[in-house]
Amino acid sequence: MYLSAERLAHANQAVKEAFGQCSVAWQAIPHWDTGDPGQLNVANGLLGGSAGFLSLGPPPSPPPPPTPTFQLTVAELIAPTPDALLTAVMAATKTLANFFDTDVLKQCFAAAPSPTNTLTFASTNAQDIQNSLIAARVLVENAGYRAPSCLITNTVGLQVLNQLVSGYYNIAEQILAAANINSLYRFEPLDGTAQTRVRMVLIGRRRRIGQGAAPDASPGEEPVDVAFSALPSLEVDGETSTGTIQFSPRVRYAARITDATGLVALKA
């Protein structure tokens, strides 16, 4: 109605690409499409008495950030080039990806069983960081996840991993190798704190998944995956009271923690 089919397809592709480039959870956690955009619930992937269902929905948008919508004039929409549309799409999609990551990664951090899979660093010196990450490696390997793991850390944690020993030697590569970690991401918040202290979550792997390669991985074998009933796309909301047209990038999903023993939360 407001956009040609070609331009709407172009905008939808921009949402998908921008979401994939901006979202840590999209890059680090395998996902799958339920195939039904109207689906409301999905199996949680657990067995026995723990089997149940999860609701599929958009990510929560905690105040004060508003829901990621944008408005454009008709003139901007029918312009010879889609520059205004694509600029607005990418800005709103970045916000949507942040809400998505906050929701999914907080769930991963909180799902690590306590006290067995919740580790506290004795200190933030190089040896203690390495010892704790090796201990996390042992936990996920004992749970059956022997492929190289994925580590997601906040900014303080990234600084600690990259501390200089003797004033010039960066230890990150050696620590990650010792802990059998082949992919590293930075995101915050990972829990409800102010993120002034180290927070990390280690995700075990059954199959080798490279940096940013989770979208191509099989989700059923990993300790966490994300089910989507609506993949990243653009919703045309309609005309506003000021005569502009409102659009919303959207996703509908549920994060499924299918085996919490494959997750380890680390903090200082």
Residue ranges and their predicted role:
Residues 1-102, 237-268:
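Flexible, glycine/threonine- and acidic-rich loop/arm segments that mediate assembly and lattice contacts
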Residues 2, 25-37, 164-268:
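Sequence/fold signature of self-assembling virion shell proteins
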Residues 3, 16-22, 133-150, 156, ...:
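Short, surface-exposed loop and linker segments with low hydrophobicity and enrichment for Pro/Ser/Thr
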Residues 13-15, 54-59, 136-140, 170-173, ...:
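Intrinsically disordered, low-complexity boundary segments flanking structured domains
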Residues 22-26, 99, 103, 140-147, ...:
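Short secondary-structure junctions and interdomain/linker hinges
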Residues 67-72, 136, 151, 184, ...:
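Generic structural hydrophobic/aromatic packing signal, biased to beta-strands
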Residues 72-139:
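Alpha-helical scaffold segments that mediate packing/assembly in large oligomeric complexes
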Residues 112-178:
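Extended, solvent-exposed, turn-rich assembly/linker loops in the middle of proteins
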